[in-house]
Amino acid sequence: MNILLTNDDGWNSPLLPFTADYLREMGDLTIALPQDEQSWTGKAMTRFGRLQVEERELCGVTGYSINGRPADCVNLALHHLCSKLPDLIVSGINMGANLGVSFIVSSGTVGACMEGNIAGVPGIALSQCLQPETYREWTNEQHLPAATVDDLCRHQREFLDAALADLRA
């Protein structure tokens, strides 16, 4: 499986090494992240200015640091940086909850998945709400069960329908 990893918290997210290491075991991983934190940017993209890409490495995986928003990162990765179109986009793990309409439509984590969906690539937006001082402890103690990711991949439409039903309520 070809996987694209992005987030809205950038390269300094304490959850990034854990997420990258886990996904690397699931398949071929490409990482495309904003160079700086880009929370609350939704699916906004850079309209003016020039996007710059810097190659980086994390957990033995080639990655790209982009001076744009999460949706920019996904767009550039899908159309210019990935050697093959990914089978899945994983956005996150977001540092904070993305619950409720205002959070969902404002989340750069979710916006990155929306950008991928426009290109026909399914995405999973992951969030974890903890106190900042407990993130590093959490990454040492927890894991993301492969069965959970597999289940999300198999039942994409069901989860999307459930999320939209909640938004309409």
What are these regions (language model features)?
Residues 104-111:
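Charged helix-capping and loop-helix junction motifs
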Residues 114-169:
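Glycine-rich, Lys/Arg-enriched anion-binding loops that position phosphate/diphosphate groups
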Residues 9, 37, 69-70, 94-97:
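Short glycine-rich anion-binding loops that position phosphate/pyrophosphate groups of nucleotides
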Residues 3, 14-80, 84-85:
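A cross-family phosphate/adenosyl-ligand binding-site feature
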Residues 34-37, 94, 128-131:
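Short, ordered loop/turn segments at secondary-structure junctions
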Residues 1-9:
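Nucleotide-activated donor-dependent transferases that construct or modify glycoconjugates
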Residues 73-103:
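N-terminal glycine-rich phosphate/adenylate-binding segment common to multiple enzyme folds
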Residues 30-32, 64, 90, 122-126:
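Hydrophobic/aromatic beta-strand patches that form the interior of the parallel beta-sheet core
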